[in-house]
Amino acid sequence: MARIAGVNIPTQKRVEIALQYIHGIGAAKAKEICGKVGIPVERRVHQLTDDEVLRIREVIDSDYKVEGDLRREVAMNIKRLMDMACYRGLRHRKGLPVRGQRTHTNARTRKGPAKPIAGKKK
């Protein structure tokens, strides 16, 4: 089992699919990485040589932000918005939708479970 960017990559899957197990790499970036390294997309991970795995690792480390670094950057961006006290930061702080969605109904994922209101029983 190959280990790239701190993630165990499944060996039986195609390289293009297996790279998507890394946080921060989707379908487009996986194809791009395969193109840079010169690996056919349909090749399986267990067919890769150690040199090819090393080249994939180097490309990801030099060109992309993945896993912990990406998570940390996203968290820092949200924290920066909250510290600035701009509209988006206030929405994050209150646990409400940030991108303009309605909250009169819906938004249960962001707001959490519905809180019962006293005297509302029928």
UniProtKB/Swiss-Prot annotation:
The keyword DNA damage does not apply. Residues 94-122 are annotated as: Disordered. One of its GO terms (cellular component) is small ribosomal subunit. GO terms for biological process: translation. Pfam families: Ribosomal_S13. Keywords: Ribonucleoprotein, Ribosomal protein, RNA-binding, rRNA-binding, tRNA-binding. The keyword tRNA-binding applies. One of its GO terms (molecular function) is structural constituent of ribosome. SUPFAM superfamilies: S13-like H2TH domain. Belongs to the universal ribosomal protein uS13 family. NCBIfam families: uS13_bact. PANTHER family: 30S RIBOSOMAL PROTEIN S13/40S RIBOSOMAL PROTEIN S18 (PTHR10871), SMALL RIBOSOMAL SUBUNIT PROTEIN US13M (PTHR10871:SF1). Part of the 30S ribosomal subunit. Forms a loose heterodimer with protein S19. Forms two bridges to the 50S subunit in the 70S ribosome. HAMAP family: Ribosomal_uS13. Located at the top of the head of the 30S subunit, it contacts several helices of the 16S rRNA. In the 70S ribosome it contacts the 23S rRNA (bridge B1a) and protein L5 of the 50S subunit (bridge B1b), connecting the 2 subunits; these bridges are implicated in subunit movement. Contacts the tRNAs in the A and P-sites. This is Small ribosomal subunit protein uS13. It comes from Rhodospirillum centenum (strain ATCC 51521 / SW). The gene is rpsM.
